[in-house]
Curated annotation (Swiss-Prot):
Top-level taxonomic group: Eukaryota
Signal sequence, start to end: 1-18
Principal subcellular localisation of the protein: secreted
Record: disease: Hypotrichosis 7: A condition characterized by the presence of less than the normal amount of hair. Affected individuals have sparse or absent scalp, axillary and body hair and sparse eyebrows and eyelashes. HYPT7 inheritance is autosomal recessive. Woolly hair autosomal recessive 2: A hair shaft disorder characterized by fine and tightly curled hair. Compared to normal curly hair that is observed in some populations, woolly hair grows slowly and stops growing after a few inches. Under light microscopy, woolly hair shows some structural anomalies, including trichorrhexis nodosa and tapered ends. Some individuals may present with hypotrichosis.
Annotated TM spans: none
InterPro entries per the UniProt record, alphabetical: AB_hydrolase_fold, Lipase, Lipase_LIPH, Lipase_N, TAG_lipase
Subcellular localization: Secreted; Cell membrane
GO BP terms: lipid catabolic process; phosphatidic acid biosynthetic process
Function summary: Hydrolyzes specifically phosphatidic acid (PA) to produce 2-acyl lysophosphatidic acid (LPA; a potent bioactive lipid mediator) and fatty acid. Does not hydrolyze other phospholipids, like phosphatidylserine (PS), phosphatidylcholine (PC) and phosphatidylethanolamine (PE) or triacylglycerol (TG).
The protein's name in its UniProt record: Lipase member H
């Protein structure tokens, strides 16, 4: 029995030592959210030397922080349940996997945990002041503002903006992940995240009709799926708590996908989501000279391109799949018809490679009008990227349940990849599509010169 008690004592001591050695993000109970919490900001440092074991740091104790390297601050937002952000560990590890840097998790869970949103939002400037004091000390030790990068989620995006404002916009970069909308919509630039808060500000808007901010806030603002309902998220309250937070959190998971090598999400500068869906805004992907902006960590590769704009701001749109890694692969389908009468309808296109892999895109955001000898360019999105397309199938539908079945006579169809403009363009001539009947054919290389 004595041996058992000694074992339990040693186990408790080892757990206590582990907790002291490796501090973790503050975990609070739902009771804390009910009664509210006072503000306490903790800074936890991760580097490649301590990837899984954080160091608590402050203005007088830097730990492993190397001021000559980039320092990325991760600032979370409102925490109505008191639990740690489920994505935090993945974000820390993802950042350190792509670059040798300092990653500082800004834990203000004591302050953000409350059922009353206004209580949390009222503390954002105080959090920003704590961060400024720490960065001031970093600068005194030889750090450069050029190397300061802040990633702010929801309320954390505005906190990052407040920090940047206190340095007159000389922070290297701020990324806002679905910046909070409530209490910030319509506010003047000094009371929210703004393009002038850093040398480069990129923003992902994923929940503009609820918890997020709709209007542009950065040098480049990304709107996945138009910034509204995200694929794979619950559409009704029957989805439980995910119904409220899934769209809002999607911005974080989209950013995470940019840290992985599985695929790269490309966006298309455009005035509106509808124009993008109609294929009017994909010129950046038609040549290797003018690349499209990339979502997430590598978005700043487009910084020099934006400097040529006045003002240096743009909106970019793209569609995603329902699950990680969320990538969609874009193609232009150019169709010239020779029907005597005008036809209106939808086109469904399938691609198949030599291995038998298939991928499908139904281009049905709005019916397309086909006129004789007029070229129509359709933007098709696929879940898979098939390198060598061996077969293509097309199906035309007017959507009518009654009346005659029409034919769509195609003089020429051309398929070109936007993700890989260097790939050969594929063509087919003299096709007749019977309504609601799938027509399969083998494409040939287009004789035209490549763009």
């Amino acid at each position: 029995m004595l041996r058992f008690y000694l074992f339990i004592s040693l186990l408790c001591l080892s757990r206590s030592d582990a907790e002291e050695t490796c501090p973790s993000f503050t975990r609070l109970s739902f009771h804390s959210a009910v009664v509210g919490t006072g503000l306490n900001v903790r800074l936890m440092l991760y580097t490649r030397k301590n990837l899984t074991c954080a160091q608590t740091i402050n203005s007088s104790a830097f730990g492993n922080l190397n001021v000559t390297k980039k320092t990325t601050f991760i600032v979370h937002g409102f925490r109505p349940t008191g639990s740690p952000p489920v994505w935090m560990d993945d974000l820390v590890k993802g950042l350190l996997s792509v670059e040798d840097m300092n990653v500082v998790v800004v834990d203000w869970n004591r302050g953000a945990t409350t059922l009353i949103y206004t209580h949390a939002s009222s503390k954002t400037r105080k959090v920003a002041m704590v961060l400024k004091e720490f960065i001031d000390q970093m600068l005194a030790e030889g750090a450069s503002l050029d190397d300061i990068y802040m990633i702010g989620v929801s309320l954390g995006a505005h906190i990052s903006g407040f920090v940047g404002e206190m340095y007159d916009g000389w922070l290297g970069r701020i990324t806002g992940l679905d910046p909070a909308g409530p209490l910030f919509n319509g506010k003047p630039h000094q009371d929210r995240l703004d393009p002038s808060d850093a040398q480069f500000v990129d923003v992902i808007h994923s929940d503009t009709d609820a918890l997020g901010y709709k209007e542009p806030l950065g040098n480049i603002d990304f709107y996945p799926n138009g910034g509204l309902d995200q694929p794979g998220c619950p559409k009704t309250i029957l989805g439980g708590f995910q119904y409220f937070k899934c769209d809002h959190q999607r911005s974080v998971y989209l950013y995470l996908s940019s840290l992985r090598e599985s695929c790269t999400i490309t966006a298309y500068p455009c005035d509106s989501y509808q124009d993008y869906r109609n294929g009017k805004c994909v010129s950046c992907g038609t040549s290797q000279k003018e690349s499209c902006p990339l979502l997430g960590y590598y978005a700043d590769n487009w910084k020099d391109h934006l400097r040529g704009k006045d003002p240096p701001m743009t909106k970019a749109f793209f569609d995603t799949a329902e699950e990680s890694p969320f990538c969609m692969y874009h193609y232009f389908v150019d169709i010239i018809t020779w029907n005597k009468n005008v036809r209106r309808g939808d086109i469904t296109i399938k691609l198949r490679d030599k291995a038998g892999n298939t991928t499908e895109s139904k281009i049905n955001h709005e019916p397309t009008t086909f006129q004789k000898y007029h070229q129509v360019s359709l933007l098709a999105r696929f879940n898979q990227d098939l390198d060598k397309v061996a077969a293509i199938s097309l199906m035309f539908s007017t959507g009518s349940l009654i009346g005659p079945r029409y034919k769509l006579r195609i003089l020429r169809m051309k398929l070109r990849s936007l993700a890989h403009p260097e790939r050969p363009q594929l063509c087919r001539y003299d096709l007749v599509l019977m309504e609601n009947v799938e027509t399969v054919f083998q494409p040939i290389l287009c004789p035209e010169l490549q763009l």
